[in-house]
């Protein structure tokens, strides 16, 4: 028992260190793509949004297949190869002077992500007990916020000199992560079943509750995608200065440090997972609606802060609900399939909002994308409410607690 507990502790420490490299490497590059290509080079927001959406669709849309391979081959080869492929994608992005090259670099980044993301997430479910998932996800969110601010501050500083430096820095960080995983990651098997790839996929598709929940979250991810596209563009529009973009992520880091753990502990005690997810989503919708009308930077940052608070409330509950519905016999297949909503949400969120931004700019109607985003959020909220009304996900968590008591 001690050996198992020690393995879990060491595994969680590894996940936290690995997550640091991946998150910093991501945030050094991706939040600045829209600023560099749209604001500095003058490319259309739809074009850049399409490239970002393509990256999201490929990475998350192919997740079910990469997850099935990870169930069969184990986590290590998938994670290591994925990290190195993303390194190559960032190197190509550094010389992207045409839309074709930008799309190619995003596709390679996506391919890398689709290889390493499902098995990394499955390792969390394997190494963390169900009743500890909510708090561990909160720890990861806290780390994500701190690493995001490090990445974006570093990226914006490098962007003053050269976008190539931004991309090379991201590439180096992912290369280090790849070497670290090749060196230290044990050859974990993340599925307890020896079923074929197709059997793993069929197992997921037969779980109707999980499938409906996943696709309903598409709208949630459409809203979340704006952190990488529309929110940075709006801050640059209102402030007129590139340096103010980093304040988005500074605010996120401060709010995460102050609120993630207290909100998680308090809400776990008094509210169901379903309630926490819906309250967080409502907060996000309320914050997004007036953004196109705001002309003052301080007011804009307050609304963005409210958006982050909504995410802080919703995200641990969303992650835990998804994890509770997975089958330990096909963990990566489940995680991979769950990325489909992120794929659809990212594709529509990036390209759709970029297209609406271009139309709104032409028609002098800057509120257009924010109105549509709010409507999408309300539809998503209604879909979640209908699911939660007829089925209590909280019962799954209670079953896990009962197992804990028996142990």
Curated annotation (Swiss-Prot):
Which keywords label this protein?
A: Cell inner membrane, Cell membrane, Membrane, Transmembrane, Transmembrane helix, Transport
Per the UniProt entry, the signal peptide is: none
GO: which molecular function terms? transmembrane transporter activity
Would I find DNA damage among this entry's keywords?
no
Q: Which segments does the entry list as coiled coil?
A: none
The record's listing under InterPro entries reads:
MFS, MFS_dom, MFS_trans_sf, MFS_Transporters, Multidrug-R_MdtH
Q: Tell me a GO cellular component.
A: plasma membrane
Please name the PANTHER family in this protein's record: MULTIDRUG RESISTANCE PROTEIN MDTH (PTHR23517:SF2), RESISTANCE PROTEIN MDTM, PUTATIVE-RELATED-RELATED (PTHR23517)
The similarity annotation says:
Belongs to the major facilitator superfamily. DHA1 family. MdtH (TC 2.A.1.2.21) subfamily.
What's the protein called, per UniProt? Multidrug resistance protein MdtH
Underlying gene: mdtH
